Amino acid sequence: MTEKSLFEYLYQEWQGLRFQFPWQLTYDERSTGIILQVHLPSRQEPASDHMMRDALNKQSDQFAYLSLTFRFGYYSKDISLQPGIFILAPNLGNGTYTGDYVQVLLKWMRYTLRQADQQLRELDRGERETLDLTWPHEAVRQDVAQRQAVNRYGNKERYSLEVY
């Protein structure tokens, strides 16, 4: 079974979403990882928050964007390094992801972005004081288990971190 490039697949999938927020997909050669950054605009000046960045991805304390980072790489498990940075580990060895697993990750990435956008709106309206962004580990696990239970989870396609 041949492996395809995860970078190319993510780029095509994300571009096909016609997503309303600016995003950038990059390949980090040092860590051999793929990084997807999505920038959600903040409608007011937030309290000092290390996640707030300007359009050039530099830390900013003025009108800015909330920068969420999704990293695909050689990790042993999914983790959140700090608020707004999500590490998504491969479900197979050697930095390989199955197509079905990537679909589950994309679903929950979109969910996380919708949650972030909603929390920003609540923050702007004064209904919230802080952002609470976490990766839905349990939901991802349950989604995979549910798909396996109804035979909607096959390991047909394989995606590698390598850029071809």
Q: Where in the sequence are the language-model features?
A:
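Non-catalytic accessory regions used for complex assembly or targeting
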Residues: 1-12, 30, 160-164
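Short amphipathic alpha-helical surface micro-motifs
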Residues: 4-7, 15-20, 66-70, 142
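Hydrophobic, Leu/Ile/Phe/Ala-enriched alpha-helical segments that form helix-helix packing faces
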Residues: 6-18, 109, 113-116, 120
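N-terminal interaction modules that seed assembly of large macromolecular complexes
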Residues: 9-63
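A short, surface-exposed beta-strand/turn
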Residues: 50-84
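Acidic, low-complexity intrinsically disordered segments
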Residues: 72-135
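Glycine-rich, aromatic-bearing surface loops/beta-hairpins
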Residues: 121-164
